[in-house]
């Protein structure tokens, strides 16, 4: 075991990273060695046991905790580890399998004080809190000391306060850094291995940067960062715009691996550090908070690569060479407590533990923690989003949560996909979670099913049981895109989250998050939220012939640019949507599948969430269909069946008494954007390579197209019918066309209706239902290609290396595929004539209650 470990250690050292944490088998072998240590290995063996085993409810932690408990109880005698040392080591394991033995050891006079010292710093107590409280009540002195320590928040006060002056060396990345730059999609397989994944950060050459990757497209500027650290300070990540794009916490993990410090007793994880950005995207900001980092929005124009600066967080100043070069205000003073606690999640759990202990001891509420500033009183009404969150925190019906209020809304629905799922699994283990408190948690395999690596196959095999054993619902590889499924399981006007930035509920509201916060939401059933402001987009008038919903999606950034609320340039970036909720009105009769196209794209606006005002009829139609789908899932053996049955009953209860929240007429918005549909007479595209760079199609007509992609969560069955009709049986189209339906249900119906024949005739490459090209983590288009795509975003290098990607509708992609270029307005409208004649049958959605095989199967499923 030692020989193999040292070999692995040297291989990783050659890469400049530490070895992997020990797994359960290695820990079992390590324990045998500790019982009979080879000569000269004592210190090494103890170091492995102390520092290289994951905490929480990891399988390896279970083996470690069982061994240490046996030694601490005196059932097993080991020369290297005394009873007291074993108890001390149990106290470093964060929570989970170590907690029960520590509580038992409070009754052992020999080690009770050591056990108490460990429990005082253990936050993940959950129901075990009651066991300690009971011992204290029964007179156990050490249990009383633990309760008092929790009440006094010694877990918090024992940690250093945020320094008044933090000296850092600047690592500046000019322009926009998106999460694809920090955590590239093709390297998604390595995300759970934080140090290894870090090596891919900034691996693609950036012409405007002071650094170069060590191997273009493979390894980022790691040595450059190490050289900056030699100035003797932590490195701060600095950029004009930081963290836009996907919700992946792996982006924050990589930044903090460069800028933070090791977490004691937790292998291969770091916390802390400083990130400075002119704009910091909201989900990235949150994952920074969760990781104990200090994210600061500040003008960075006077900072240069390699500068040594002082960050004065309490004064709100950046000082360079004795001169103040920028001033800032922290998002909230609570950030100081989050950093001190080692992260926002630690702070929330710890504050709750302290409150519980004080209540049990009959003490008043603690005044130790900083509280968020309550917003100013106002008599204004509430927006739809504010009312939804109000209901989720238990306010009286019709009351809402004002912007700026800190709250913890109930998470009714939580989603996890397969490139973030393995990280969410690890975070759930770290949180000692053995069962979900959120009402419904769903796991998908949409990003890796088509072209799995060995590590993906392992995930496909192991993750479903991990999720369903905790009461979640696990999809299967090939089922399709997480969002297209999760939307089918939603309850109106409820709140949720998901480990993917496109978790944007078309009914209700979701606040997508990184894997740490998703794990917290799934485990505890609530999620921390500083209620954002809202921006209202109001459509008016009638859609014009040939104009699609995707064009309305792109109209939002286009009209925001016209109103001065959005700029494409990154320096001094303006984005009125960033960190706010996008609320959409004026299209109340959209089908829910159509509404999702609008809510989904709020991710590209960097909005915190999205609501859409819909009439009851389309929602009733959708939910009636969804009950049949969920019954089919139960019949097909999807687990956890009890969770699906519970959701069916809740949907049926809503349908029996349909009731929708509505915004008050006097609700306040940060901005209101009005879009007159009569003014949109042609498609709107987003130009390479920025989803904010929206233009009318006529401005780019004639651009040669090499490849086209019709797929992603932005599509539904209607788009594929339209594309098949527009291809019109043409052979040998001049463009390489990729087609990927969002779910297996869409695929099945499209095949049945004969549309796959049209794709085949055209020579299209039809992909397994799922994400396909959209994330760029598996298949990609040819290097340097110009592409028209229905995917979510067109960041540089996302669909393929050095590509130029236009975002547009499925209809436009099909027409461009036939012509080999972006059409003129006349060419477009001529082609769309065939669709305009038959919109009712083309844009007909999947109503499972009206599809015979689904309806028949559902009849056989009873509660």
Specify the residue positions occupied by each region the protein language model found.
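Amphipathic alpha-helical scaffolding segments comprising HEAT/armadillo-like alpha-solenoid repeats
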Residues: 24-31, 55-74, 94-106, 125-136
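Charged, low-complexity interaction regions
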Residues: 17-21, 38-40, 57, 75-78
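An N-terminal, globular interaction/scaffold subdomain
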Residues: 39-64
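Residue-level detector of extended alpha-helical repeat arrays and alpha-solenoid scaffolds
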Residues: 42, 79-83, 112
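Amphipathic alpha-helical packing elements
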Residues: 2-31, 36, 335-348
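Fe-S-dependent hydro-lyases/dehydratases of central metabolism
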Residues: 92, 98, 102, 114-863
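Hydrophobic core/packing positions within alpha-helical solenoid repeats
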Residues: 45-52, 89-90, 118-123
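Alpha-helical adaptor scaffolds
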Residues: 68-87
């Amino acid at each position: 075991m030692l020989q193999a470990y040292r070999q692995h250690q040297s291989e990783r050292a050659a890469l400049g990273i530490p070895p992997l944490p020990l797994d359960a088998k290695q820990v079992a072998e390590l324990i045998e060695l500790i019982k009979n240590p080879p000569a000269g290995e004592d210190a090494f063996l103890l170091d492995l046991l102390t520092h290289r085993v994951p905490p929480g409810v990891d399988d390896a932690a279970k083996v470690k905790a069982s061994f240490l408990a046996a030694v601490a109880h005196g059932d097993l005698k080991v020369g290297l580890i005394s009873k007291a040392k074993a108890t001390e080591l149990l106290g470093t394991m964060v929570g989970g399998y170590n907690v029960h033995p520590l509580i038992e050891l409070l009754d052992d006079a020999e080690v009770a004080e050591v056990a108490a010292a460990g429990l005082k710093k253990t936050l993940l107590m959950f129901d075990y809190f009651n066991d300690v409280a009971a011992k204290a009540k029964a007179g156990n002195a050490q249990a009383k000391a633990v309760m008092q320590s929790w009440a006094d928040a010694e877990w918090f006060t024992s940690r250093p306060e945020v320094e008044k002056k933090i000296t850092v060396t600047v690592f500046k990345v000019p322009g926009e850094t998106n999460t694809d730059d920090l955590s590239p999609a093709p390297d998604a397989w390595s995300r759970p291995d934080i140090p290894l994944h870090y090596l891919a950060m900034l691996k693609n050459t950036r012409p405007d940067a002071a650094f170069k990757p060590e191997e273009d497209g493979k390894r980022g500027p790691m040595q450059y960062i190490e050289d900056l650290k030699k100035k003797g300070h932590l490195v701060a990540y600095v950029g004009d715009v930081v963290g836009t794009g996907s919700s992946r916490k792996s982006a924050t993990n990589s930044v903090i691996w460069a800028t933070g410090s090791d977490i004691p007793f937790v292998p291969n994880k770091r916390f802390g550090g400083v990130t400075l950005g002119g704009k910091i995207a909201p989900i990235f900001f949150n994952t920074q908070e969760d990781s104990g980092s200090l994210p600061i929005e500040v003008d960075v124009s006077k900072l240069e690569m390699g500068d040594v600066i002082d960050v004065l967080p309490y004064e709100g100043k950046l000082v360079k060479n004795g001169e103040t070069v920028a001033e800032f205000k922290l998002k909230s003073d609570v950030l100081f407590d989050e950093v001190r606690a080692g992260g926002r999640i630690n702070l929330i759990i710890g504050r709750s533990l302290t409150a519980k202990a004080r209540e049990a001891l009959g003490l008043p509420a603690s005044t130790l923690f900083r509280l968020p500033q309550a917003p100013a009183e106002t008599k204004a009404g509430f927006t739809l989003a504010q009312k939804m969150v109000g209901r989720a925190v238990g306010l009286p019906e019709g009351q809402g949560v004002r912007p700026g209020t800190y709250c913890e809304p109930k998470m009714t629905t939580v989603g996890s996909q397969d490139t973030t799922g393995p990280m969410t699994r690890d975070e759930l283990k770290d949180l000692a979670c053995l069962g979900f408190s959120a009402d419904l948690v769903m796991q998908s395999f949409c990003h890796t099913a088509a072209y799995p690596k060995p590590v993906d196959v392992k995930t496909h095999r192991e993750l479903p049981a991990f999720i369903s054993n905790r009461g979640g619902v696990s999809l299967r590889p090939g089922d399709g895109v997480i969002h297209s499924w999760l939307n089918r399981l939603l309850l109106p006007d409820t709140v949720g989250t998901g480990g993917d930035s496109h978790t944007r509920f078309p009914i209700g509201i979701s606040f997508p998050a990184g894997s740490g916060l998703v794990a917290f939401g799934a485990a505890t059933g609530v999620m921390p939220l500083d209620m954002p402001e809202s921006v209202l987009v109001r459509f008016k008038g009638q859609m014009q012939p040939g104009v699609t919903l995707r064009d309305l999606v792109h109209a939002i950034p286009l009209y925001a640019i016209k109103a001065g609320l959005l700029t494409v340039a990154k320096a001094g970036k303006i984005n009125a949507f960033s960190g706010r909720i996008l609320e959409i009105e004026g299209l109340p009769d959209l089908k829910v599948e159509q509404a999702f196209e609008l809510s989904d794209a709020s991710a590209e606006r960097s909005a915190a969430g999205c609501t859409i005002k819909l009439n009851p009829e389309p929602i009733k139609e959708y939910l009636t269909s969804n009950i049949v789908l969920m019954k089919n899932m139960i019949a097909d053996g999807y687990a956890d069946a009890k969770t699906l049955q519970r959701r069916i009953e809740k949907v049926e209860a809503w349908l029996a008494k349909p009731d929708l929240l509505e915004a008050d007429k006097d609700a306040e918005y940060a901005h209101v954007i009005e879009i007159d549909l009569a003014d949109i007479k042609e498609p709107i595209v987003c130009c390479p390579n920025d989803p904010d760079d929206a233009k009318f199609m006529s401005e780019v007509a004639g651009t040669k197209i090499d490849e086209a992609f019709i797929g992603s969560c932005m599509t539904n069955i209607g788009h594929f019918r339209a594309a098949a009709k527009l291809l019109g049986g043409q052979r040998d189209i001049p463009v390489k066309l990729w087609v990927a339906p969002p779910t297996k249900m869409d695929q099945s119906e499209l095949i049945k209706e004969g549309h796959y024949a049209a794709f085949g005739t055209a020579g299209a490459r039809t992909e397994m239902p799922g994400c396909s090209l959209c994330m760029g983590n598996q298949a990609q288009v040819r290097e340097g290609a110009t592409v028209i795509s229905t995917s979510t975003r067109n960041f540089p290098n996302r669909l393929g290396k050095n590509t130029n990607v236009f975002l547009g509708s499925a209809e436009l992609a099909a027409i461009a595929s036939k012509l080999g270029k972006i059409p003129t307005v006349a060419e477009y409208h001529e082609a769309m004539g065939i669709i305009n004649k038959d919109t009712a049958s083309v844009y007909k959605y999947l109503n499972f209650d009206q599809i015979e095989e689904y309806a028949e199967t559902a009849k056989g499923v009873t509660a």
